[in-house]
């Protein structure tokens, strides 16, 4: 079989859906249960928090959940925290979901929801910039107090009640949730806590995604957040899932990998989903016929490493100041892909006190280059960053 570059099945890049969501089957099966409980019983499950490093596929999973909910006729919206105030981002994403709902359901059954949402959105955007595509008057006194936590709780309640009446569900997805302010996180916690007190729980699910620091941030916003969510870690793929990510897309095109070639590719990618897609793409581009062999892999790995270096690591490295790079080098030497203590890092850069590196540490956290998995610890937000740093002059 000739390997055709035009038919390349791999899709490297931020947020791009790979051909196979390898290793994520348990999570998707869990969402299927949420869907069925909402549609068959009118009941909601606990909301989810997905946490993991950069490039492991959190955004891809949110997009997949959005597609599944939308195709099932749910009221589904996806927003991103940190770009604009969260009330504005949620309103903007919900407008599209409301417009879709008006095309699927009789307007009369949506009238109360649309009126409440109109009042909520006017509080967020007083100029009235959001158009629902239908004439609707705002309903005063429910979700328009101007207190985001109270208004969001009221809006979620109306959304859940409407969905139950329609025999469907609501899915709210928020990406980069670690970028939300403490008050925005507290508002989300309050709204979800309020939903869970209904008996039976209303069929609205929120799925937030963010860095591994997100669970601690939610708990700092309100202490009960530790028990509020179903926390799911999205990590590196194990060997079998990594194998599926590389082999299944080519098998569908009658192209195989020989054993040595596959072993070399797997050993280099270390289960990192972003890198696996880059490896697959460049190996395919170098291959001429099936089966893919070790020479194809060796050539492809050079290009894949260059793509990941230039597209993922280099921009992060170049955003750091010299002092911040010193701290990153120390973290790379001490921890690799794990964690190091602030005291160890301070000693490694020749500082007698941890306070002497606190400015550089805080700036690196703000830039999203490192995070604090626990008090007094630091780790890189991107797998493999330590290897890139080791290759720098």
Regions found by a protein language model. Name each.
Residues 1-46, 96, 112, 200:
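A short, basic N-terminal segment
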Residues 213-229:
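Short regulatory helix/loop adjacent to the ATP-binding pocket of P-loop NTPases
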């Amino acid at each position: 079989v000739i390997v055709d570059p035009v038919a390349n099945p791999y899709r490297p890049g931020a947020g791009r859906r790979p051909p196979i969501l390898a290793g994520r089957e348990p999570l998707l099966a869990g969402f299927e249960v949420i869907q069925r409980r909402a549609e068959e019983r009118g009941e909601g499950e606990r909301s989810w928090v997905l946490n993991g490093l950069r490039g492991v596929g959190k955004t891809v999973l949110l997009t997949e959940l959005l597609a599944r909910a939308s195709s099932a006729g749910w009221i589904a919206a996806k927003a991103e925290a940190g770009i604009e105030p969260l009330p504005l981002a949620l309103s903007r994403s919900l407008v599209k979901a409301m417009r879709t709902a008006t095309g699927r359901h009789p307007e009369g059954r949506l009238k109360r929801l649309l009126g409440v949402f109109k009042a909520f959105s006017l509080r967020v955007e007083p100029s009235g910039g959001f158009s629902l595509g239908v004439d609707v008057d705002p309903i005063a006194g429910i979700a328009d107090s101007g207190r985001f936590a109270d208004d969001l709780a009221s809006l979620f309640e109306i959304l859940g009640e409407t969905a139950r009446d329609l025999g469907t569900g609501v899915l709210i997805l928020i990406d980069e949730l670690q970028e939300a302010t403490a008050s925005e996180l507290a508002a989300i916690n309050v709204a979800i806590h309020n939903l869970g007190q209904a008996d039976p729980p209303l069929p609205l699910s929120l799925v937030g995604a963010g860095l591994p620091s997100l669970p601690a941030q939610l708990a700092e916003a309100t202490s009960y957040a530790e028990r509020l969510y179903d926390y799911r870690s999205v990590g590196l793929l194990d060997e079998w899932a990594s194998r599926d990510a590389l082999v299944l897309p080519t098998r569908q095109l009658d192209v195989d990998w020989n054993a040595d070639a596959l072993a070399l590719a797997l050993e280099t990618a270390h289960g990192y989903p972003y890198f696996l897609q880059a490896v697959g793409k460049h190996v395919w581009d170098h291959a001429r016929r099936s089966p893919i062999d070790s020479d194809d892999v060796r050539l492809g790995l050079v290009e894949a490493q260059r793509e990941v270096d230039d597209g993922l690591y280099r921009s992060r490295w170049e955003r750091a100041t010299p002092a911040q790079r010193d701290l990153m080098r120390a973290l790379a030497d001490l921890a690799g892909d794990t964690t190091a203590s602030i005291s160890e890092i301070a000693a490694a850069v020749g500082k007698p006190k941890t306070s002497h590196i606190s400015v550089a540490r805080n700036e690196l956290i703000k830039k999203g280059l490192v995070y604090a998995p626990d008090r007094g610890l630091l780790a890189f937000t991107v797998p493999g960053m330590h290897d890139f740093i080791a290759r720098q002059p």
